[in-house]
Amino acid sequence: MSKGHIIRERYETTAKGYDELYRAEQFEKYFIALKRFPPHGRVLDAGCGTGLLIEYLGLNKLLSGVDEYVCLDYSRNMLDIAKGRARLYCPSKCLLIEGNVEDLPFRDNVFDLVYSFTVLDLVDDLEKAIMELSRVSRGRVIMSLLKNLKYKDLLLEKEYKLLGTTSKDVIFYI
């Protein structure tokens, strides 16, 4: 069984408790990223989980410049929770799709901005996932990685630019 399938199963069973455990940690990443790259136009939230980014954007009145907001996640249970947030914060602009960041079901260059928080640490093929995120974006791709991962330094040595850090994560963009 692939790493992705194992992770998917884990999120399927832990979806209900995710927000309680990770909301503050995720909001810290969003604060850092959104200072520089607020959402606009067509937005992809790749690995949206329970929709915490939608909640953050809605609470901070940052959805007005968004024409369409696409939530993609590999876990059906996480998407079910995200659906409630989508209805609350952007009912007419939100689309939820079950999918994998290593094989995105979109044409090239269709999104103005792509966010992918707490996802790349979990994929089977990091390079393929980043290539897919870049492929579907005509603008920036904002991502996070755990600080302690060995490939984090290699990515930051390339064309990736550092946005900031939290106690656990590095937030960067291309």
Question: What residues fall within each predicted segment?
Answer:
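Short catalytic micro-motifs in class I SAM-dependent methyltransferases
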Residues: 118-119
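Class I SAM-dependent methyltransferase SAM/SAH-binding core
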Residues: 44, 49-103
